[in-house]
């Protein structure tokens, strides 16, 4: 049976330092390996987010759907929705791939699947955080105004959406490790997340009968709350921050518990 390597002479701070170094090394490796280099990975994230923003900007403009947005910069409205959703989705997929595909590498001393979850997730955070900031600054240069009422709220809300995606990915990774039907569930779940995230919808204008279809999704709350922080003329009425915080906490705790169970179960089998 495989047992993790233990150094009897190691101290707590040595362990923290070694863990941080491993995290940094794996994160750099993920950033470079994703698209052949750190710069290419960043450009890929910017390009994908920009493409979606432009497509839906023209759709909403030419289809006369701008009234569904808030009073303010339509592109900022779309950038917030696209950026937050894709950051959470790509983090979820990264954590999922780490939970299901890193067990061979995790058999080496000091490594574990959760370390790969962290490194892959941090790589996604790095790419999409910078991508959103660049898109925002580029839009401000074109329009001549940088509309963001409470910029201090951007980082905590973006981090919360990132953590939510990581916890959901760990939970899905456990399901796909043990259940054959989890692959189909993941596909359906991703489609439902795409529809109910509210990235192109003003949450305040959704009819009450349709609200339950959206409010279960923590990303719906986070995107709407960020728009409330961004636009001076918009106040969220149908969303809050308590729900996504609770869901994110439960997903992260359950994800780490299930990871520990998977690790122990695999060690017993091997």
Segments (PLM) and residue ranges:
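Hydrophobic transmembrane alpha-helices and immediately adjacent juxtamembrane helices
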Residues: 1-270
């Amino acid at each position: 049976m495989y047992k993790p390597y233990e150094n009897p002479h190691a101290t707590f701070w040595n362990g923290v330092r070694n863990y941080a170094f491993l995290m940094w090394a794996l994160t750099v490796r993920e950033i470079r390996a994703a698209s052949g280099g750190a710069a290419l990975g960043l450009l890929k994230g910017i390009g994908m987010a920009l493409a979606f923003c432009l497509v839906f900007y023209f759709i909403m403009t030419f289809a006369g759907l701008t009234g569904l947005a808030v009073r303010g910069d339509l592109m900022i409205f779309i950038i917030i929705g696209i950026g937050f959703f894709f950051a959470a989705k790509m983090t979820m997929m990264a954590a999922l791939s780490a939970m299901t595909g890193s067990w061979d590498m995790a058999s080496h001393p000091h490594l574990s699947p959760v370390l790969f979850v962290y490194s892959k997730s941090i790589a996604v955070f790095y790419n999409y955080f910078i991508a959103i900031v660049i898109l925002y600054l580029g839009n401000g240069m074109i329009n001549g105004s940088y509309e963001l009422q409470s910029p201090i709220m951007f980082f905590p809300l973006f981090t919360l959406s990132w953590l939510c995606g990581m916890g959901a990915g760990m939970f899905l990774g456990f399901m796909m490790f043990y259940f054959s039907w989890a692959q189909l569930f993941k596909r359906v779940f991703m489609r439902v997340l795409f529809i109910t995230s509210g990235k192109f919808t003003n949450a305040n204008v959704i009819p009450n009968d349709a609200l339950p279809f959206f409010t279960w999704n923590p990303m719906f709350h986070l995107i709407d709350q960020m728009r409330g922080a961004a636009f001076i003329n918009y106040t969220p009425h149908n969303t809050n921050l308590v729900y996504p915080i609770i869901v994110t906490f439960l997903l992260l705790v359950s994800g780490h518990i299930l990871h520990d169970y998977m690790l122990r179960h695999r060690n017993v089998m091997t």
